Amino acid sequence: MNKIKDSFLIQDLETLSGIKAHTIRIWEKRYNLLSPERLNRNIRKYSLADLQKLLNVSILYCNGYKISKLSLLSDEELHETARKISLESVQSNYNVNTLIFAMYTFDGDQFDKVYNELSESMGFEEMFVKVYIPLMDHIGVLWQTDAIKPAHEHFISNLIIGKIVLNTAEISSVTSEDATIYVLYLPVGELHSLGLLFLNYCLKKRGKKTVYLGGGIPFSNLETLNTKFPSIKWICSFVVERTREEKEAFLFEYVDFLKKSDSSSLIVGRVMEEVSGKEEFKERITFFNSFKELPFFE
């Protein structure tokens, strides 16, 4: 079983906070900013408390506060000042940092606290775009640098998914004159459903009729829907990297499927960028690198 990460090297702090390791070391020596445990002459081990403090310091430092002043504040004062900055500036990453810390400590209550505070000043769609997307982007970096375990990513992703489902359920049914049914699915091999779930929420919020299928859906299953609905707009997303040959094989098969039903599709995912220019695909498929590029958000 993987041990939950509760201690960090200075390289971990650099990755998580965006503050260079050299700068962190200078702040330690000059201002006694952090209190690491010294393992030997050159290696220091930092605690979760050190991480939380540095995350708050990084927010305030990036907002113009002098490190000499910040070093004089208590941990509680740093936390409260960073929180106030977040309320004054939508661009502040205070909430992202708070959620990263909640992820490390598996603190669902802290996640809900941030959600409830944000809900007082913005809608869920704005919250997702301004907080959850930057959070997941940052988590992607942490994953690539081996700074987090799968348990961390699964924990925070499932909390966000829970909020998407909650907000989707609260949308009142709207009778739309548009007969198009938007069918959202993940192809076989794709398991990252968070973005697609959010898109389903956004479509419903805009009065669109949707069918959300989730992940691992083969073409044979999709054909069943053609017998149920006369007008379908298919939407799928890709995150998992594939070879060029695998991408083209999927798209050729997909285009044949779309032609049979005289339908079209939107595909979201930067991984398809290298093959998206082929004329054979453009007739039936429109490609987007990210969900934010979709026409629903114009």
Where are these regions (language model features)?
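Long amphipathic alpha-helical segments
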Residues: 16, 20-25, 29-172
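A short alpha-helix capping/helix-coil boundary motif
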Residues: 2-4, 34-37, 78-79, 177-180, ...
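Polyanion-binding surface elements
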Residues: 3-23
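Short, amphipathic alpha-helical "recognition" segments used to contact nucleic acids or chromatin
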Residues: 1-5, 57-58
